[in-house]
């Protein structure tokens, strides 16, 4: 149908910017168009001889399916990139499609994770802790607090990884459920420990005293 053609044309045009956008691309396919893509992939995967032009399209079709599916569980360590350092293609797309998470690419991925989750699905993520307290991230904080449930949060601070020796990158990891808030969550701060090993030891010694707010 014309709708299917238009949706697939949009998807393939969007993928021309895949080097800049990666997995934050939104294809917005109708159920019927997605089913067509799925059936096409399944058909050619059963064939022993696949024309070269089809082979070239199969990876694109698989990407479309992956980014239009929903998941019960996701685990992410997203890229960090402040909005001011994004190229024009990425900046425009994030502003138009992930406005609440536009401050940094890692907050964009927080919204992406929620979009990809099934109802009551969960995602775990480690990223920079700036979204937890900086005023410029109030939009993403409000969205998370109002629309999801924070199951647990671990404030890691600096030197989370042995290869990161400075104070610039300070981390937090957390687990979130894609549902309306239903409990207060568990919280632990190990940021006072100054090495990766010390954080691990502090976590093990304190985990039975997790703070429930």
Task: Annotate each language-model stretch with its function.
Residues 1-69, 73:
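Class I S-adenosyl-L-methionine-dependent methyltransferase module
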Residues 65-213:
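Signature of N6-adenine DNA methyltransferases within the class I
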